[in-house]
């Protein structure tokens, strides 16, 4: 099909390309993207996650999470040896942070709840933390007072460490019962004001980085002889980092499929509880967020086209197809065989249709080709029989950002959206994360670090291609920036910055300053005459003293 023929050509199975004489027409069109190009009820927001921003790891009765334990006991697993003990101190600074959101013109804030902050002992029988519940109540109330809609993620990778130690966390089916209990507490405590729920964030990342690559807790996966290939795969998506020298070996050919299966059942049961007991009275919606690095065929061969489809199946389809159809993708059933768990008839009915919307986190794309090599051992990384590359004929798929896995490929978001509409029954979609990082260059002054034109262009171009997909009938309802603030980026620690708001880690006060991209978003979302953002110092001397460790 031809879309805006003077600017762009997109045909089925092809990569969008400029058709203007020098590409300048396309560039200028993207730069002119504006709020009014989207429906008036289209939601623009920003996103964070509990461990990445809250800090206060042992305040208010909070229990230890798997990430608390991992980063504090094995600091070598984080590229800069940092942790989220303080993170960016959102726990103590949330009121000021809501003011920032309001000034930016955001209408929604997506954040996650910390399971061990609400249930320090992992389950209800060990008690609910009143302080933890109060923190989230205060945050929700502050958002609503600022006319900002809360979008809550129930689980964004921080399981109570006590459950990890007791039975292996998501590797054991016992986690389903505990997750149901935790989810219901969330619905009960916050559902009167929260109208958008996300059960899980990127179950693919949690599963693969934790149980195949060994880069996330519980650091299970490969054996020593697998390290070179696994290191390559570990860097293919956000958050992947270096492998630990002493991580715990598991079985990368079976464990990820068990973990994923339990995650899907956790999701489905939580949705069932919400729909059965809370949705009618509370009037909310519930879904799941998944990630996709779009797999583009390396060549026009049928083998590579099929491989690209498998690549998408083994990442996005692994978790989306079950909630849409009740079954895993056919390619996974074929290539994984008996190692892929099966849903019982009852579970299939529970899982199928367990969503009101689908969240998508999109950052990048990759070239994919067929790999007919027969592996010597079973592993998720080789089960799809695919090879990935960020180059075609020595030409990168896009400009590289701060992380070695993130290449800027705006047209990939269009491909994902159109493919989802076609394959998954035209679902309601929210872009729950989209963003780009820069290296945290400590030699730069804070003033220099605020100049992030790369981020402005990244968002302009992705919004442009997202709008093209919407013009083709894709039912996208919202877009969330990753991230609102610079924060702790998992295995990358504080070595990269994703925020539109700069966080000054060095001054000990975690001062927030608007980058150029924040100003761009402000202008995009509000009237040109809006009051500009100001670089105001922190107001709380007590907070400064506490963070410095003084009295």
UniProtKB/Swiss-Prot annotation:
- Whether Iron counts among this entry's keywords is no
Q: Which GO terms describe its cellular component?
A: nucleus
Q: Which UniProt keywords apply?
A: Glycosidase, Hydrolase, Nucleus, Plant defense
Which GO BP terms apply? carbohydrate metabolic process; defense response; protein complex oligomerization
What is the annotated localization of this protein? Nucleus
What ranges does the record give for the region Required for the homomultimerization, renumbered to this chain?
502-551
| Catalysed reactions, as listed in the record | oleuropein + H2O = oleuropein aglycone + D-glucose
Where does the source fall among the domains of life?
Eukaryota
Q: Which GO terms label this protein's molecular function in UniProt?
A: beta-glucosidase activity
Q: Where is this motif: Nuclear localization signal?
A: 542-550
Comp. bias regions, Polar residues: 1-27
Gene3D superfamilies cross-referenced by the UniProt entry:
Glycosidases (3.20.20.80)
The record places the site described as Controls the gate shape and acceptance of substrates at 405
Temperature and activity? Optimum temperature is 37 degrees Celsius.
Q: Which residues bind a beta-D-glucoside?
A: 52, 156, 201-202, 363, 433, 482, 489-490, 498
List where Basic and acidic residues composition bias occurs: 535-544
Q: Which SUPFAM superfamilies match?
A: (Trans)glycosidases
The catalytic site is made up of 202 (proton donor), 433 (nucleophile)
Query: Could you tell me how activity relates to pH for this protein?
Result: Optimum pH is 5.5.
Q: Where is this region: Disordered?
A: 1-33, 532-551
This entry's Enzyme Commission designation comes to 3.2.1.206
| PANTHER family noted in UniProt | GLYCOSYL HYDROLASE, MYROSINASE 3-RELATED
Family named by the database record: Belongs to the glycosyl hydrolase 1 family.
State whether it acts alone or in a complex, and with which partners, per the record.
Homomultimer. Native form of the enzyme requires at least an octamer conformation.
What name does this protein carry?
Answer: Oleuropein beta-glucosidase
- What is this protein's gene name? GLU
């Amino acid at each position: 099909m031809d879309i805006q023929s003077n600017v762009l050509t997109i045909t089925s199975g092809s990569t969008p390309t400029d058709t203007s004489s020098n590409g300048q027409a396309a560039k200028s069109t993207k730069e002119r993207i504006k709020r009014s190009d989207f429906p008036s009820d289209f939601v623009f927001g920003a996103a964070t996650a509990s461990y990445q921003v809250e800090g206060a790891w042992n305040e208010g009765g909070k229990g230890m999470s798997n990430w608390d334990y991992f980063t504090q006991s094995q600091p070598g697993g984080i590229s800069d040896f940092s942790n989220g003990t303080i993170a960016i101190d959102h726990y103590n600074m949330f009121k000021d942070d809501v003011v920032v959101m309001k000034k930016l013109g955001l209408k929604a804030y997506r954040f996650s709840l910390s399971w061990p902050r609400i249930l320090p002992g992992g389950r209800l029988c060990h008690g609910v933390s009143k302080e933890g519940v109060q923190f989230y109540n205060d945050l929700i109330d502050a958002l609503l007072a600022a006319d900002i809609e809360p979008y809550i993620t129930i689980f964004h990778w921080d399981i109570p460490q006590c459950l990890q130690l007791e039975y292996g966390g998501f590797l054991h089916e016992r986690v389903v019962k505990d997750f149901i209990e935790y989810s219901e507490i969330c619905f009960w405590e916050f559902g009167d004001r929260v109208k958008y729920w996300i059960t899980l964030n990127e179950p693919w990342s949690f599963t693969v980085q934790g149980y195949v690559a060994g880069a996330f807790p519980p650091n299970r996966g490969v054996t020593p002889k697998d390290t070179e290939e696994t290191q390559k795969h570990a860097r293919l998506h956000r958050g992947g980092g270096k492998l630990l020298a002493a991580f715990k070996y598991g079985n990368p050919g079976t464990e990820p499929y068990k973990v994923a299966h339990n995650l899907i059942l956790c999701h489905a049961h939580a949705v069932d509880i919400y729909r059965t007991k809370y949705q009618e009275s509370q009037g909310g919606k519930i879904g799941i967020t998944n990630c996709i690095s779009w797999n583009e065929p390396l060549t026009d061969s049928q083998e590579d086209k099929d491989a690209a489809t498998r690549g998408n199946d083994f990442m996005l389809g692994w978790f989306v197809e079950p909630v849409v159809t009740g079954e895993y993708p056919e390619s996974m059933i074929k290539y994984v065989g008996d190692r892929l768990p099966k849903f019982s008839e009852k579970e299939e009915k529970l899982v199928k249709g367990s969503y009101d919307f689908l969240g998508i986190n999109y950052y990048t794309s990759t070239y994919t080709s067929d790999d007919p090599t027969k592996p010597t051992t079973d592993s998720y990384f080789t089960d799809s029989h695919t090879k990935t590359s960020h180059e075609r004929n020595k030409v990168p798929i896009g400009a590289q950002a701060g992380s070695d896995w993130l290449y800027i490929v705006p047209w990939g978001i269009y491909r994902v959206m159109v493919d989802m509409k076609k394959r998954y029954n035209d679902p309601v979609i929210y872009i729950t994360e989209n963003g780009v990082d820069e290296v945290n260059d400590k030699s730069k002054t804070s003033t220099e670090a605020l100049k992030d034109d790369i981020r402005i262009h990244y968002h302009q171009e992705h919004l442009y291609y997202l709008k093209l997909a919407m013009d083709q009938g894709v039912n996208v309802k919202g877009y969330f920036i990753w991230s609102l603030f610079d924060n702790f980026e998992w295995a990358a620690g504080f070595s990269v910055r994703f925020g539109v708001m700069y966080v000054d880690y060095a001054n000990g006060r975690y001062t927030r300053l608007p980058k150029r991209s924040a100003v761009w978003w402000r202008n995009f979302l509000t009237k040109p005459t809006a009051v500009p953002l100001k670089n105001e110092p922190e107001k709380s001397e007590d907070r400064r003293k506490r963070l410095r460790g003084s009295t």
